[in-house]
Amino acid sequence: MERTYVMVKPDGVQRNLIGNIVSRFEQKGYTLAAAKLVTLSKETAETHYSEHRERPFFGELVSFITSGPVFAMVWEGEGVIKAARQLIGATNPSEAAPGTIRGDLAVNVGMNVVHGSDSPESAEREIAIFFKEEELNDYQKDSNKWV
Ligand code: RTP
Ligand code: MG
């Protein structure tokens, strides 16, 4: 079954948005495979965002993402990688459609409340950064038969 990495960023944790964000994935019909509140080290943050190493905002991005705890999650279900990106909305919240997480809950491109893996390769890489294999729960929910 397909899995993706989703993370409530420090601004989302500070603004009490964990429940709101988790709820959207649950209501859509996805299954939570793993979750934890964790404060990223500079090294982990740089590894996670390594594709942006050369970008002018990299320092700011790493400093922001390590500024407080994040809520790290693995979500599972049919087409979840692409669907998570759709639920999250455009990178810049000012361009994100209403109804999406960023469209509803954020204003600033730097503080856009949530991260979601952008491809199957990224999902696999990012899940491995944050979770050990034994932390990934493999279970069925009865409600899955309705979605
Ligand atoms: P994320 O990785 O955090 O889920 O966001 P994303 O895929 O929608 O966007 P991405 O291109 O991967 O950028 C990663 C994060 O860098 C910050 N950013 N700032 N100042 C800027 O122009 C700028 N561009 C990107 C954003 O916080 C974005 O989420
Ligand atoms: Mg990205």
Swiss-Prot record:
<feature type="binding site">
    <location>
        <position position="85"/>
    </location>
    <ligand>
        <name>ATP</name>
    </ligand>
</feature>
<dbReference type="InterPro" id="IPR036850">
    <property type="entry name" value="NDK-like_dom_sf"/>
</dbReference>
<keyword id="KW-0547">Nucleotide-binding</keyword>
<dbReference type="InterPro" id="IPR001564">
    <property type="entry name" value="Nucleoside_diP_kinase"/>
</dbReference>
<feature type="binding site">
    <location>
        <position position="102"/>
    </location>
    <ligand>
        <name>ATP</name>
    </ligand>
</feature>
<dbReference type="GO" id="GO:0006241">
    <property type="term" value="P:CTP biosynthetic process"/>
</dbReference>
<dbReference type="GO" id="GO:0005737">
    <property type="term" value="C:cytoplasm"/>
</dbReference>
<feature type="modified residue" description="Phosphothreonine">
    <location>
        <position position="91"/>
    </location>
</feature>
<feature type="binding site">
    <location>
        <position position="9"/>
    </location>
    <ligand>
        <name>ATP</name>
    </ligand>
</feature>
<dbReference type="Pfam" id="PF00334">
    <property type="entry name" value="NDK"/>
</dbReference>
<dbReference type="GO" id="GO:0006228">
    <property type="term" value="P:UTP biosynthetic process"/>
</dbReference>
<keyword id="KW-0597">Phosphoprotein</keyword>
<keyword id="KW-0460">Magnesium</keyword>
<keyword id="KW-0963">Cytoplasm</keyword>
<comment type="similarity">
    <text>Belongs to the NDK family.</text>
</comment>
<dbReference type="GO" id="GO:0004550">
    <property type="term" value="F:nucleoside diphosphate kinase activity"/>
</dbReference>
<dbReference type="GO" id="GO:0046872">
    <property type="term" value="F:metal ion binding"/>
</dbReference>
<feature type="binding site">
    <location>
        <position position="57"/>
    </location>
    <ligand>
        <name>ATP</name>
    </ligand>
</feature>
<comment type="function">
    <text>Major role in the synthesis of nucleoside triphosphates other than ATP. The ATP gamma phosphate is transferred to the NDP beta phosphate via a ping-pong mechanism, using a phosphorylated active-site intermediate.</text>
</comment>
<keyword id="KW-0808">Transferase</keyword>
<protein>
    <recommendedName>
        <fullName>Nucleoside diphosphate kinase</fullName>
        <ecNumber>2.7.4.6</ecNumber>
    </recommendedName>
</protein>
<dbReference type="InterPro" id="IPR023005">
    <property type="entry name" value="Nucleoside_diP_kinase_AS"/>
</dbReference>
<keyword id="KW-0418">Kinase</keyword>
<dbReference type="GO" id="GO:0005524">
    <property type="term" value="F:ATP binding"/>
</dbReference>
<dbReference type="InterPro" id="IPR034907">
    <property type="entry name" value="NDK-like_dom"/>
</dbReference>
<keyword id="KW-0479">Metal-binding</keyword>
<keyword id="KW-0067">ATP-binding</keyword>
<dbReference type="GO" id="GO:0006183">
    <property type="term" value="P:GTP biosynthetic process"/>
</dbReference>
<keyword id="KW-0546">Nucleotide metabolism</keyword>
<feature type="binding site">
    <location>
        <position position="112"/>
    </location>
    <ligand>
        <name>ATP</name>
    </ligand>
</feature>
<feature type="active site" description="Pros-phosphohistidine intermediate">
    <location>
        <position position="115"/>
    </location>
</feature>
<feature type="modified residue" description="Phosphoserine">
    <location>
        <position position="122"/>
    </location>
</feature>
<comment type="subunit">
    <text>Homotetramer.</text>
</comment>
<feature type="binding site">
    <location>
        <position position="91"/>
    </location>
    <ligand>
        <name>ATP</name>
    </ligand>
</feature>
